[in-house]
């Protein structure tokens, strides 16, 4: 596997820490050892997160190509757009963000706090759009790029989740290589890796990265899109493309992609009672915050699988914390009593 041939522009502090979730593990019976790898602590750029790791492999193209405006898209509380705005500010570029109405959630401050608030503070041109949730290429995003061109700018396209960019999966191939190095220091290998999946490139990169040591199907994706067929297809497609890019040496198959569909409901961006219980339990056992859109759902999945005995006794499970906590402010009504 050859990841080193791709240029990388450092936006993160370095390897993200792995630490044990001792109290949560004990609370769930102590038969499974839970750990977290903290992508939510990966950068000083506006709280960082998994998209910041991905952007390290996209930004060299933007710099070398002389692009002056980063153009991205997401929901109103998109973590992606906040991270793109931060990178643009860091690099001295302009930023245009299309924020679509991906979540059927009514709150008076939903479009004024959290991620979107930070993007505005960082100087991004934030454009609200009424279109609903979809993980594909969007007309509103294409229109934003055309607007930049007409104004004399040179837009660099960054699709939702970085996922439709040909190099969108590389950052999490690097994640897998980083985990392997940390496992050498820890003196053991993780048996399973749990990760949230929506647009697909995070899990796709992990699948390729861990395929290098035979653990592709030990990456347990927890769907948070509530459109799992579309998400699964995208994970598989991106993983196959990424495997070719890094010269993995074997094809990624359907069996390599594990996507658990039990925890994504009722729909994208809306937590269920299990999500909320998992957020509170993790926070109160470990002081580790997760959000109602992504990480709360993957945390719910991991907790439920431990409770159900789906991980064999003695397993070591690595939870990939991808970020997303800034969105908590937009859901403050749900937590008004804690």
Curated annotation (Swiss-Prot):
EC numbers: 3.5.99.7
Active site per database record: 78
InterPro entries registered for this protein in UniProt: ACCD_DCysDesulf, ACP_carboxylate_deaminase, ACP_carboxylate_deaminase_bac, TrpB-like_PALP, TrpB-like_PALP_sf
Annotated function: Catalyzes a cyclopropane ring-opening reaction, the irreversible conversion of 1-aminocyclopropane-1-carboxylate (ACC) to ammonia and alpha-ketobutyrate. Allows growth on ACC as a nitrogen source.
Organism: Paracidovorax citrulli (strain AAC00-1)
Entry's Gene Ontology BP terms: 1-aminocyclopropane-1-carboxylate metabolic process; amine catabolic process
HAMAP family listed in its UniProt record: ACC_deaminase
Cofactor(s) this protein requires: pyridoxal 5'-phosphate
Protein name: 1-aminocyclopropane-1-carboxylate deaminase
Name of encoding gene: acdS
Modification sites for N6-(pyridoxal phosphate)lysine: 51
Matches recorded under SUPFAM superfamilies: Tryptophan synthase beta subunit-like PLP-dependent enzymes
Keywords carried by this UniProt record: Hydrolase, Pyridoxal phosphate
């Amino acid at each position: 596997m050859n990841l080193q041939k791709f240029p990388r522009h450092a936006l993160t502090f370095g390897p993200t820490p792995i630490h044990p979730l001792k109290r949560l593990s004990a609370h769930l019976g102590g038969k499974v050892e839970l750990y977290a790898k903290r992508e939510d602590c990966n950068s000083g750029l506006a709280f960082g997160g998994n998209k910041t790791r991905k952007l390290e492999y996209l930004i060299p193209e933007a710099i070398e190509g002389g692009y002056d405006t980063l153009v991205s898209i997401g929901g109103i509380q998109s973590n992606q757009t906040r991270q793109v705005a931060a990178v643009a500010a860091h690099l001295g570029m302009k930023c245009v963000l299309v924020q679509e109405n991906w979540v059927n959630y009514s709150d008076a401050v939903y479009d004024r706090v959290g991620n979107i608030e930070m993007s505005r503070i960082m100087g991004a041109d934030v454009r609200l759009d009424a279109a609903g949730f979809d993980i594909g290429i969007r007309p509103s995003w294409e229109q934003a790029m055309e607007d930049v061109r007409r104004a004399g700018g040179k837009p660099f396209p960054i699709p939702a989740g970085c996922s439709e960019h040909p190099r969108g999966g590389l950052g999490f191939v690097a994640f897998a290589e980083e985990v392997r190095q940390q496992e050498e220091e820890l003196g053991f290998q993780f048996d399973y890796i749990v990760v949230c999946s929506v647009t697909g490139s995070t899990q796709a990169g992990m699948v390729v990265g861990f395929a290098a040591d035979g653990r592709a199907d030990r990456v347990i994706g927890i769907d948070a899109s509530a459109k799992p067929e579309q998400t699964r297809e995208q994970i598989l497609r991106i993983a196959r493309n990424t495997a070719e890019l890094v010269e993995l040496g074997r094809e990624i198959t359907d069996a390599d992609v594990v996507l658990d569909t039990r925890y994504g409901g009722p729909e994208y961006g809306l937590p269920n009672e299990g999500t909320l219980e998992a957020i509170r339990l993790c926070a109160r056992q470990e002081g580790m915050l997760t959000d109602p859109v992504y990480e709360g759902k993957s945390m719910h999945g991991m907790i439920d699988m431990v409770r159900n005995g789906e991980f064999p006794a003695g397993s070591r499970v690595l939870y990939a914390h991808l970020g997303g906590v800034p969105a908590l402010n937009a859901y403050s009504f749900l937590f008004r009593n804690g």
